[in-house]
Amino acid sequence: MAIAETDTEVHTPFEQDFEKDVAATQRYFDSSRFAGIIRLYTARQVVEQRGTIPVDHIVAREAAGAFYERLRELFAARKSITTFGPYSPGQAVSMKRMGIEAIYLGGWATSAKGSSTEDPGPDLASYPLSQVPDDAAVLVRALLTADRNQHYLRLQMSERQRAATPAYDFRPFIIADAGTGHGGDPHVRNLIRRFVEVGVPGYHIEDQRPGTKKCGHQGGKVLVPSDEQIKRLNAARFQLDIMRVPGIIVARTDAEAANLIDSRADERDQPFLLGATKLDVPSYKSCFLAMVRRFTNWASRSSMVIFSMRLATASTRRPAVGLSAKAFSAWSPTRSTRGGRTASSRSTAFSTRSSRGSWRPGRTTRA
């Protein structure tokens, strides 16, 4: 389903060509391929974004069409494809040779193996927007190369040899991890464009909030409102329509594991939100801020200074008042959950006081 528009007056050949493209795009929207899909934009808006120089993304387009038909066939038969994510192009080729029809390229694989600029770790989507499309490009190139090599070798065979040698399907049936889209609508469109350009036909987009994105096994997931996720999906389909690719979009949710949401603005989310029933109890945020304020003020109350400053103060006061000063180190009370507090990279903070008696040097420790 889509919003249809008609133009009553067309004069110039340029406008006529434009209207023909709009009509063709509307027929494309209304085809059975997109039954049940509601677009929040018009065919005219899509054509306005295409320009006059056609660009054909044949690898992604052909793979998307064939992959979609295969998935619908399996769905009708109540069957599925069991697959996994390869770490290398060689593994992707081996998967195809083993009869695994589809390949899943997860952001977790990109994060886990790292790169020349990124440390390996859990999938927090902290890698650049281009990282997963670049990894996908390597897999697609490997599959296309394997297909060319197979085609050449089979041409050298006799008919009997070809009949005895299995022909593998190296079409890049890939679902790639688009994560949260890496931002707003322009970022989602940019990401989908990159996937299409390297030949990827499928993409999953999840409903976590960028910046707080967590790997599947981690807690603390924060969801965006439903309307924000819909905007992401709509932006992805808009970019695919501009590029004339019937890509496969997987709308993924982390709602099963997440217990936080970014906003309560969308009424569709409100039935699932928790609310306090005792208004005399301070809010969680107020309690948390009070706790932070309590421990933050500790730093000023404890009079933290570096030991050399305390020693200079004690040396100045001693002849002036006729008293000796005692300076001692108290490193442990200043320690946070991540380490001791420091005033610079080479000094440790100290809590100090002066008293009567002889001065003794404190033990210094580098943090």
Swiss-Prot record:
* Taxonomy, superkingdom: Bacteria
What Gene3D superfamilies does the annotation carry? Phosphoenolpyruvate-binding domains
UniProt GO molecular function: isocitrate lyase activity; methylisocitrate lyase activity
Chemical reaction(s) catalysed:
D-threo-isocitrate = glyoxylate + succinate
What Enzyme Commission number(s) apply to this enzyme? 4.1.3.1
Where are the compositionally biased (Low complexity) regions? 334-358
Alphabetical GO biological process terms = glyoxylate cycle; isocitrate metabolic process
InterPro entries cross-referenced by the UniProt entry: ICL/PEPM (IPR039556), Isocitrate_lyase (IPR006254), Isocitrate_lyase_ph_CS (IPR018523), Pyrv/PenolPyrv_kinase-like_dom (IPR015813), Pyrv_kinase-like_dom_sf (IPR040442)
Region ranges (Disordered)? 332-367
Identify which residues the record assigns to the active site: C215
What Pfam families does this protein map onto?
ICL
Cofactors demanded by this protein? Mg(2+)
Keyword annotations for this protein? Lyase
Which chain regions cross the lipid bilayer?
Answer: none
Q: What does this protein do?
A: Together with AceAb, they could catalyze the formation of succinate and glyoxylate from isocitrate.
Q: Which family does it belong to?
A: Belongs to the isocitrate lyase/PEP mutase superfamily. Isocitrate lyase family.
State what protein this is by name: Putative isocitrate lyase subunit A
Q: Which organism is it from?
A: Mycobacterium tuberculosis (strain ATCC 25618 / H37Rv)
Phylogenetic classification of the source organism: Bacteria, Bacillati, Actinomycetota, Actinomycetes, Mycobacteriales
